[in-house]
């Protein structure tokens, strides 16, 4: 009745007897009433019904929809159902392996018994035959001796005994051959390496096919295949975390190598930048030194130029003053000579005029000193302005000033020559 109810549950569902208005029970795949072996593939209790290896009916739920829900869930092969299923299947295989070993032991024992049972009588018959043969040989020798002695009756009696022994020996030989033929005609058995059933060696192919298509043989074959498949799946599942860990480790190592190479590149870049900055600083220092040397050379040249210009200006001013004084002296001397020549009688007026001239000369000399100071200040100012000018303008100025100086010196020489001539003429006049 239980198997029929399970069959109806599988065909029509567990809620087959509920009324339309009654609430259906929603059972999840992880409920304890659900067969976990069926979720993993199949229930072993369904494989061996009505066989010698029948495991009895399974009282838990076998539902294909629940199995599909389990396969689609995120906890598939993570709850441990597959490992429990594998252990149960391995226990069934261990049991059938023990059955196969017992079958082999029984076959070996029966074969030993048969061989020992057949060999025992045969060996005894051989021994009897050998004894009879020895007796026959002895009796024949005795018969020959009796015949040579002329004892014919005794020899005939012994001859009858020899005939009886020969008949007995032939009987033993025929018995041994019969036992061997019976042993040869007995059927040979073997054990099936899958389910442990006994098979007849050389049996008809139809009976062999019936055995191979039987529930027991196919059930154990399915169990063996499922065990191998589950082992492979679980091995891959255990290798996946290791592979993920290995891939993660390799990724971390690659990232560390990339970071190390990046740090090395940054270090090289910083080193290159420092070297570039050092070279730039060195070039800046070189430019500053060259600039300072040029400024010192320009300053020294400008200082020397200012000194030369000051000396030239001073010389020019002195030469101009001398020329002016000489020209005044010449004018005064000439006027004095003319006045003396024209107005000799007015000596007193001349003296007065001379005194006035001397006073005016002193006044003019003071004004000249003031004018000279003013000009020197202006020259200093012009020198500061000249300091800002370029080297080429200063050189051009120098050339122009040199030419002016030469011209002025030539003028000065001419004036000096003229003054000397005037002095000579004045001396001649006074002497006259």
Swiss-Prot record:
Top-level lineage group: Eukaryota
Keyword check for Metal-binding: no
Any coiled-coil regions, as ranges: 124-181
Single Gene Ontology MF annotation: DNA binding
Chain positions found as N6-acetyllysine: 231
Compartmental location: Nucleus speckle
Family from the record: Belongs to the Luc7 family.
Major place of residence: nucleus
Basic and acidic residues composition bias: residue spans: 234-287, 302-311, 368-414, 421-432
Protein name: Luc7-like protein 3
Organism: Bos taurus
Annotated positions of the N-acetylmethionine modification: 1
Biological processes annotated in GO: mRNA splice site recognition; RNA splicing
Pfam families recorded: LUC7
Cross-link (Glycyl lysine isopeptide (Lys-Gly) (interchain with G-Cter in SUMO2)): 424
UniProtKB keywords: Acetylation, Coiled coil, DNA-binding, Isopeptide bond, mRNA processing, mRNA splicing, Nucleus, Phosphoprotein, Ubl conjugation
Residue ranges of the region described as Disordered: 234-432
Residues bearing PTM Phosphoserine: 3, 110, 115, 420, 425, 431
Assembly mode: May interact with SFRS1 and form homodimers. Interacts with JMJD6. Interacts with RBM25. Interacts with RSRC1 (via Arg/Ser-rich domain). Interacts with RRP1B.
């Amino acid at each position: 009745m239980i198997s029929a109810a399970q069959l109806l549950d599988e065909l029509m569902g567990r809620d087959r007897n509920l009324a339309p208005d009654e609430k259906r029970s929603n059972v999840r795949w992880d409920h304890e009433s659900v067969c976990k072996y069926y979720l993993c593939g199949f229930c072993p209790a369904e494989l061996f019904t009505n066989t010698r290896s029948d495991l009895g009916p399974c009282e838990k739920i076998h539902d294909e929809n629940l199995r599909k829900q389990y396969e689609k869930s995120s906890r598939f092969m993570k709850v441990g159902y597959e490992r429990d299923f594998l252990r149960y299947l391995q226990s069934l295989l261990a049991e059938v392996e023990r059955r196969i070993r017992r079958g082999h032991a029984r076959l070996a024992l029966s074969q030993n018994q048969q061989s020992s049972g057949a060999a025992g009588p045969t060996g005894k018959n051989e021994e009897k035959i050998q004894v009879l043969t020895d007796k026959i040989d002895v009796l024949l020798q005795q018969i020959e001796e009796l015949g040579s002695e002329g004892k014919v009756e005794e020899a005939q009696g012994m001859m009858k005994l020899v005939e009886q022994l020969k008949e007995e020996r032939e009987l033993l030989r025929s018995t041994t051959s019969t036992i061997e033929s019976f042993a040869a005609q007995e059927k040979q058995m073997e054990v099936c390496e899958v389910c442990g059933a006994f098979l007849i060696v050389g049996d008809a192919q139809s009976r062999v096919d019936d055995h191979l298509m039987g529930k027991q043989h196919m059930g154990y074959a399915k169990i063996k295949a499922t065990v191998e498949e589950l082992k492979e799946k679980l091995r891959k599942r255990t290798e996946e975390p290791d592979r993920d860990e290995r891939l993660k480790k390799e990724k971390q190592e690659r990232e560390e190598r990339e970071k190390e190479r990046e740090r090395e590149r940054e270090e090289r870049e910083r080193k290159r930048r420092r070297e570039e900055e050092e070279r730039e600083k060195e070039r800046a220092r070189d430019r500053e030194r060259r600039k300072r040397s040029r400024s010192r050379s320009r300053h020294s040249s400008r200082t020397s130029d200012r000194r030369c210009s000051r000396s030239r200006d001073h010389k020019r001013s002195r030469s101009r003053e001398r020329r002016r004084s000489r020209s005044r002296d010449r004018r005064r001397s000439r006027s004095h000579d003319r006045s003396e020549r024209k107005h000799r009688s007015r000596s007193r007026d001349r003296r007065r005029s001379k005194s006035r001239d001397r006073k005016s000369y002193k006044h003019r000399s003071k004004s000249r000193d003031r004018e000279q100071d003013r000009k020197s200040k202006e020259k200093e100012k012009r020198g500061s302005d000249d300091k800002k000018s370029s080297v080429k303008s200063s050189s051009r100025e120098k050339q122009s000033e040199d030419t002016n100086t030469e011209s002025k010196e030539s003028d000065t020489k001419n004036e000096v020559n003229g003054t000397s001539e005037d002095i000579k003429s004045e001396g001649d006049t006074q002497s006259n």
